[in-house]
Amino acid sequence: MRRMTDPIDYRALQTIGWPWPGAPELPAWQALFDAHPQARPGRVIEQHRTGYVVADAPEAALKTESPAEWQRPRFPSHERAAVGDWVLLDGIKIVALLPRRTAIKRGAAGEHYHQQVIAANIDTVFIVCGLDADFNPRRIERYLLLVGGGGAQPVVVLTKADQTEYSQDALDVLEELAAQDIPLLAINGKDPSSAAALLPWLGAGQTVVLVGSSGAGKS
């Protein structure tokens, strides 16, 4: 983590998903920067009960303190920072949560139903499913429901495309997804030229997460 007196390195921030080549372009973000002129932006990479680990470059992380109000039992969980959130830091203290561009949420257990943010500011979600015994259209649909409505772009990635006896059947089952303009790719992860089909979603300032069962080919 850089010193507070150092200029903000937006190029380094872009490598961890900062969505612009320079200063923030959203008015709501600009307003918070103006309200906290001494603060610096960072991204939450770990979430703990009383604090967070925040980064401002790929290998620069800092343990930080969350605002006192975030630790109150009745404070709404979705108003606390989550992994992927951008925050403003003054020293080791989080002084502002920058408005989320996107959010992936799920229902949280408790006396009253509420939604929990499990990842924020995600541009693309690769929903990974193997074209082998792992292939499960219903699981893909569940992931699409999880992603839907949060602003992130779902991309269905069918791995192990070298197992051609499954590929065409799988694509036929998922024709409906294509009709909904959801990108659908069948790739062979062992072939770099095949995996290169994912590059359009992996540009500077882009944040991608992968979801799928164990053994689906996410690695």
How should these model regions be labeled?
Residues 1-137:
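N-terminal accessory targeting/assembly segments
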Residues 49, 89-92, 99-103, 149-152, ...:
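Non-catalytic alpha-helical coupling and interface elements of nucleotide-dependent molecular machines
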Residues 58-60, 109-110, 140-143, 170-173, ...:
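Short, glycine/charged-enriched secondary-structure capping and boundary segments
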Residues 74-77, 143, 198:
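Short beta-alpha junctions and helix-cap segments that line functional grooves
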Residues 93-111, 141-144, 184, 207-217:
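A broadly tuned preference for mixed-charge, low-complexity surface segments
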Residues 118-185:
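Phosphate-binding glycine-rich loops and their immediate beta-loop-alpha structural context
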Residues 153, 162-219:
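Canonical P-loop GTPase G-domain recognition
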